[in-house]
Amino acid sequence: MGYRVEADRDLCQGHAMCELEAPEYFRVPKRGQVEILDPEPPEEARGVIKHAVWACPTQALSIRETGE
């Protein structure tokens, strides 16, 4: 089963905690909002992605399971 990483742009305040936790999957430009570099990352990245989602202080990130 696959998964997709999603961001709620209304909640993101650009704290960049996700980028600190998983820089290969998230980027936050100065005074910007999160950019998800790979919205459907490999299964082996799930642990680091979950940690980055957990680290978001505004809970702007989420993981959605896909049927694939």
UniProtKB/Swiss-Prot annotation:
Keywords: 3Fe-4S, Electron transport, Iron, Iron-sulfur, Metal-binding, Transport. [3Fe-4S] cluster binds at residues 12-13, 16, 18, 56. SUPFAM superfamilies: 4Fe-4S ferredoxins (SSF54862). GO terms for molecular function: 3 iron, 4 sulfur cluster binding; metal ion binding. It comes from the Bacteria. Its cofactor is [3Fe-4S] cluster. Pfam families: Fer4_15. The keyword Iron-sulfur applies. Binds 1 [3Fe-4S] cluster per subunit. InterPro entries: Fe-S_cluster_ET. Ferredoxin that is the redox partner of cytochrome CYP51, a sterol 14alpha-demethylase encoded by an adjacent gene. There is a positive driving force (of about 95 mV) for electron transfer from NADPH through the redox chain (FprA and Fdx) to CYP51. Thus, the overall process is thermodynamically favorable. This is Ferredoxin Fdx.
